[in-house]
Amino acid sequence: MGRKDKRWVLQRKRDFYYKLAKKLKYRSRASFKLMQLNEKFNVIKPGKIVLDLGCAPGGWMQVAREIVGDKGFVIGIDLQPVKPFEYDNVVAIKGDFTLEENLNKIRELIPNDEKKVDVVISDASPNISGYWDIDHARSIDLVTTALQIATEMLKERGNFVAKVFYGDMIDDYVNLVKKYFEKVYITKPQASRKESAEVYVIAKRYTGKKWEEEDKIKRVKKVENEDNELLAKKIKEIRKLKSKK
C-alpha cells in the first residue's frame, strides 16, 4: 500500500460519518447524504417505488428502504455485485444501467401495471482519471444518462436525485433538467466531505415530457483507451473554441 493509500485509509477511519455508518451498520457513509437530502427536500416518501442507479455497495438502498417501509419497493442496479438484503422488497441487479436490456429487467421487477417508479436516485461516479477536466466531463456524461433513464422510468410528478461533479458544464446540465422537472435545486449535504467537488441535483415533479435526443449535452465522449493527458488537452481546446463564439 502506497503513502497516498495509507493516508486515505487513515483519513477515512477518522471520518465521523464513516464511524457512524459502521456503528449503525450502514454499508456506506453515503447513506447519511441521502438521509440529509430527503430530510430537506422530501423526495422519497413511505410506500413509494425507488430506483437506484449505480447502487453499490447499497447504502442508499438501505436508507430508501427505511423510508418507503414494507409497502414500498426499492430496486438497484450496479456493475458491481451487491450483497443481498434481508427484505423481500429490496432487489439489486448486477449490470450496466445504460443498457436497454437491463432496464427491461428492472421493468419486470416493478410491482405495478404501468411499470414506472416514483423516484430515481443516483450516487454513481465515473472512473476517476485524476484529470479534473476529464472527470467533470465524464460525470456530466453519466448524470445525463441517469436523467434520460429518469424520463423513461418515472411516473409523472416523480422525483430525481443525482450526484454530479461541480464544474463549468453544470449550468448547462441544470438547465437541461429544468426542461423535464418543475423544480430543480443544487445542494451539498453536510455528510459530503468539504474538499469534495460533488454536489447533488434535486429535481421534483417530473412533467411527463419525453426525452429528446438533441438534449445530449455536447461534450467529449469517454475514450477509455486514449491517453488521459491527451484527452484533457482536447477538452480544454474545445472550451477555448466555445468561449470565442
Curated annotation (Swiss-Prot):
Q: What is its main location?
A: cytoplasm
Subcellular compartments: Cytoplasm
Q: Which Pfam families match?
A: FtsJ (PF01728)
- UniProt binding sites for S-adenosyl-L-methionine: 58, 60, 78, 96, 123
Q: Which UniProt keywords apply?
A: Cytoplasm, Methyltransferase, rRNA processing, S-adenosyl-L-methionine, Transferase
Give the family this protein belongs to, as stated in its UniProt record: Belongs to the class I-like SAM-binding methyltransferase superfamily. RNA methyltransferase RlmE family.
| Job description of the protein | Specifically methylates the uridine in position 2552 of 23S rRNA at the 2'-O position of the ribose in the fully assembled 50S ribosomal subunit.
Q: What is this protein called in UniProt?
A: Ribosomal RNA large subunit methyltransferase E
Which species does this protein come from?
A: Methanocaldococcus jannaschii (strain ATCC 43067 / DSM 2661 / JAL-1 / JCM 10045 / NBRC 100440)
Gene transcribed to yield this protein? rlmE
